[in-house]
Amino acid sequence: MAKNEKQFVEEITKMEDDFPQWYTDVITKTDLVDYAPVKGFMVVKPYGYALWEKMQEFMDKKFKETGHKNCYFPLLIPESLLNKEAEHVEGFAPEVAWVTHGGNKKLEERLCVRPTSETIICTMYAKWLKSYRELPYLYNQWCSVVRWEKSTRPFLRTSEFLWQEGHTLHETAEEAQEETIQQLEVYKALCEELLAMPVVAGQKSESEKFAGGERTYTIEAMMHDGKALQSGTSHFLGQHFTKAFDITFADREGNLANPYHTSWGASTRLIGGLIMTHSDNRGLVLPPRVAPIQVVIVPIAAKKGNVMETVDKIYADLKAKGVAVEVDDRDNYTTGWKFNEWEMKGVPVRVEIGPKDIENNQAMVFRRDTLEKDSMPLEGLADAICDLFDVIHNDMFEKARKHREDNTSIVENMDEFRKALEEKPGFIKTMWCGDAECEAKIKEETGATIRCLPFEQENLGHKCVYCGKEADSMVVMAKAY
């Protein structure tokens, strides 16, 4: 490796030396994001936005398959609307950004820049809904929201972020509950089928649930450093908002009733999760299904023989199969530089083709996830690479799943709890009595929170990890982003 090529890679801090700096190096040096002039805001650059577009495409297809429609609601919400649901405003008030002037004129009422849209959407639903025949309302919007965060990190926690938020109304509580779980399953599929990111699905504790909701469900992923990342949430809101906003409909008996309400969302923090699940000290490692560029072809000695003719054929064959492929035929960079750059950008597959390869009717195929290189026959190469995508996805998923399992501890008491956090940072499975005071004490003493009560419960005993009282709920706890 030439000196400048080696330096190119060494510009990324090693994650074992300084994990936060490693993350910052990866997201900036791979051109995903840049810092905006306003603290806590980010510019998502084309390569980073392409990742979000892939996620959008996956979710949008799933939403529409179940009858959901996209729409758009205003950015600004009158303060009086925000105040209508007491728990909700209390939960979001510290993070709200306020508009107080229109031009040079002070507004009669402050307007908040949406931190989430329940209040404005419910206001409109109250205006529109008349009869049970119109239900369910199945609406989703793609937008940005603003939450004035004190401590920020691009993608993971920013004052403005991109997301989708679904808001639905239903005739019965059972239908609303079914909707809530259905959308959580969409997020689970997004993480596991597109991002190769294993997640634990479950219900949030009362103290961790959405402000103004009855029940919140979540998917939690483990990052390289053992911390949890909440990767998508779905809320059963009951009738809290529909009563507060006087949303009524004529039911089947002709009586006025309040519908049942859900909301659910996933955001660009998933990009941060993707990076911290798979990437390494050389840069990004992207699963093929979400990678903006799935294959890069690097010609070797491009001007010799029929190298470029062969490259063009491989390119055309891959394009015909819907593969996102690029040819790097820049003549002002060395081959080594090109290899390092594409590895840093996380392109899943690199195809190298030169005169000797053509003589042998083969190409060299490099996998970014394993850093392994093998020869493949030119005949049927495009099909072989498409098959390889599935192998890479499954291998990456399994590697992340094993990392989670290897860094999950089972504990029975607080001594074991503290020891596990110190010796093997990661998830902790334990029993909890359901008392919010025990939950708060654990957080205060260790910094770990209940990430969820998993749907897949395990019997780990009958005593609460903190107080020793009778317990019948297994929880997953961790420090979290």
Swiss-Prot record:
InterPro entries associated with the record: aa-tRNA-synt_IIb (IPR002314), aa-tRNA-synth_II (IPR006195), aa-tRNA-synth_II/BPL/LPL (IPR045864), Anticodon-bd (IPR004154), Anticodon-bd_dom_sf (IPR036621), Pro-tRNA-ligase_IIa (IPR002316), Pro-tRNA-ligase_IIa_arc-type (IPR004499), Pro-tRNA_ligase_II_C (IPR016061)
EC number: 6.1.1.15
UniProt xrefs under SUPFAM superfamilies: C-terminal domain of ProRS (SSF64586), Class II aaRS ABD-related (SSF52954), Class II aaRS and biotin synthetases (SSF55681)
Chain ranges passing through the membrane: none
Keywords from the named record: Aminoacyl-tRNA synthetase, ATP-binding, Cytoplasm, Ligase, Nucleotide-binding, Protein biosynthesis
NCBIfam families linked to this entry: proS_fam_I
Domain-level remarks: Consists of three domains: the N-terminal catalytic domain, the anticodon-binding domain and the C-terminal extension.
UniProt name for this protein: Proline--tRNA ligase 2
Native source organism of the sequence: Clostridioides difficile (strain 630) (Peptoclostridium difficile)
